[in-house]
Regions:
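C-terminal region of N-terminal signal peptides and the immediate post-cleavage residues
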Residues: 24-49, 528
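Extracytoplasmic/lumenal domain signature
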Residues: 47-83, 88, 95-136, 141-237, ...
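Terminal targeting segments of Actinobacterial cell-envelope proteins
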Residues: 1-9
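Intrinsically disordered, low-complexity regions enriched in serine, threonine, proline
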Residues: 6-7, 29-31, 59
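N-terminal export leaders
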Residues: 12-13, 264
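Compositionally biased, intrinsically disordered low-complexity segments enriched
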Residues: 4-5, 16, 50-51
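Hydrophobic membrane-insertion alpha-helices, especially the h-region
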Residues: 15-27
């Protein structure tokens, strides 16, 4: 997603060899066992176990993973202290989309704000205009804390918001940044009352929410800090990851950051951080300077981690993977994977349980490389010299391709295109199993929870499809008609759906028998069964 580079500071020409800055760290990773198994002993008619009837005991418990993120956790709820949906696409492999049940007949339960809308003035391409609501990627966080369900998000009113998920009332006052707070927030996974969020004001914020009604910024990362030379823009759109006290965050200034947070509490019991820079990683290299000399090298993807490899992509289409296995020992990340899509790759990379990557890329430049490799693709990092497993084109006239992050299902990967196509694709072969056309822009990422596929369009329709058999054209379950284009990605949490639109409103949706239905604010939203 390209924005004109704001004329804030002179862009200096620099050598584009890989630059990595590292400081010594210490610490270990503690990984919890997962035990999803159950065993039932066989008995005879009198209730006594018999040797012939006692089945062999099996277990599905995985041993603790010695590394950053177990690849086998792909598709699973993030196994952390905080109970919730905590970051864009739910977990470090960007492959978990929320917890059901999914409403069967949703209606608007409440909207926020109660009057007016979340709107702010900002520039794009040198033109200043009013932006309302929330847009790409705009995936809310929903989590449990102190006996209460919270929902948090950034808005186009410059604000960071923390609401009661049952009522829409503010739990913590809005924190106002200096520009649009676009992108998706991350909530601390380890129980610390911290939120992590970027803004178009060139800052990435770490905010404490344990100071009563007033949020407090404990630390800011500025796009011009640490001596990096901004290449393109200075926004922070990507949703950070926090793992083992390390913050992983991407910048539109063309740099990626790893920071040791050193979280703790002071004598008064208030949360603290003492951040230390661990590494800065460039989104570019010398070859990219030849292939993409316009220097549009910003990172809008959220970081993805599978095993000990960190992945991100940039607006020139360069996908990189860095080995971070020894970062905690003070060893610099080393690049172990490189692939060039040829065009703007803003959709976040998704990793499956095999460590295979699913990538969506845009069709804007129309160059030979993007024409060759397509816009929907599967990559295998274990064969770095020839990683492309399959690809599909989306090369209609004008801007085309993928802004939405793909979703993984049962043997199927779901893609949504700029022009409104939604596709179910065989994960192994790349065969298109079925396709729908929603008729308008689909930038929100597909959401799959409890065999229901949810996708919004730019006419304000939030659509749900039955994908209990994902290999057949899924029937429509319901449509909710909202005001404004849906660019955001909804969050599903225990019978509710949360999202914002470009109308200026944030919505909570649920079934009519939801207890919150009696406190519905005035709204024009309505549900239409499929």
């Amino acid at each position: 997603m390209q924005h004109a580079a704001p004329p804030k500071r002179r862009v200096w020409l620099l050598g584009v060899g890989a630059v990595v800055v590292v400081v010594m760290l210490w610490g270990v990773v503690a990984w919890r066992d997962r035990d999803d198994s159950s065993a039932t002993a066989a008995t005879d008619g009198g209730g006594q176990q018999t040797a012939a009837e006692v089945p062999e005991t099996t277990t599905t418990t995985r041993p603790p993973y010695d590394g950053w993120v177990d690849p086998l956790s792909s598709g699973e709820k993030w196994d952390v202290e905080t109970d919730g949906y905590l970051t864009f696409r739910g977990n470090p492999t960007r492959s978990w989309y929320g917890e059901g049940p999914v409403p069967s007949d949703p209606q608007v339960l409440w909207t926020y704000p109660g009057a007016g809308g979340m709107c702010g003035r900002s520039s794009d391409g040198g033109n200043v205009s009013t932006w309302c609501g929330d847009g790409w990627t705009g995936n809310p966080n929903v989590f449990e804390r102190d006996g209460r369900t919270w929902v948090s998000f950034g808005g186009y009113d410059y604000g960071l918001h923390w609401l009661d998920a049952d009522t829409g009332e503010e739990i913590v006052d809005t924190y106002t940044t200096g520009d649009l707070a676009k992108g998706s927030m991350t909530t601390d996974p380890d129980g610390f009352p911290l939120s992590y969020k970027g803004s178009r004001d060139s800052n990435f914020y770490v905010v404490a929410t344990d100071r009563g009604e007033q949020p407090e910024v404990l630390w800011k990362l500025n796009a011009y800090d640490y001596g990096v030379q901004k290449i393109w823009n200075d926004d922070f759109d990507g949703a950070a990851l926090v793992i083992d006290d390390h913050l992983f965050v991407s910048g539109e200034n063309s740099w990626f950051y790893i920071v040791k947070l050193n979280r703790g509490y002071d004598a008064a019991g208030k949360v603290t951080v003492a951040p230390q820079l661990v590494a800065t990683l460039p989104s570019f290299d010398d070859q990219l300077a030849v292939d993409a000399p316009d220097r549009h090298w910003s990172i809008e993807t959220s970081p993805t981690i599978s095993g000990n490899t960190l992945y991100f992509a940039n607006s020139a289409g360069l996908i990189q993977g860095f080995d971070i296995s020894r970062v905690k020992d003070g060893v610099a990340p080393t690049r172990v994977f490189r692939y060039w899509t040829g065009d703007d790759t803003d959709a976040t990379i998704v990793a499956d349980a095999d460590g295979t990557l699913y990538v969506g890329s845009e069709w804007e430049k129309g160059n030979a490389r993007s024409k060759q490799v397509g816009q929907m693709m599967k990559l295998d990092p274990s064969r770095p010299d020839d990683p492309l497993v399959w690809s599909l084109p989306d090369q209609v006239a004008g801007k085309a391709g993928i802004w939405a992050t793909p979703a993984l299902g049962d043997g199927v990967v779901y893609f949504a295109t700029n022009a409104g196509r939604v596709l179910g694709v065989d994960k192994v072969t790349g065969e298109v199993l079925w396709e729908k056309n929603l008729g308008s822009q689909t930038w929100g990422s597909p959401v799959v929870v409890d065999d229901t596929l949810i996708e919004g369009d730019c006419e304000g329709n939030l659509n749900a499809y039955d994908v209990s058999d994902p290999r057949v054209d899924p029937p429509l379950e319901w449509t909710v008609e909202l005001d404004g284009c849906i660019e955001t990605t909804p969050a599903v949490w225990r019978g509710r759906i949360y999202l914002a639109t470009r109308s200026g409103q944030f919505y909570a949706l649920g079934d009519p028998d939801d207890p919150a239905a009696t406190t519905t604010s005035s709204s024009t939203g309505s549900a239409t069964p499929g």
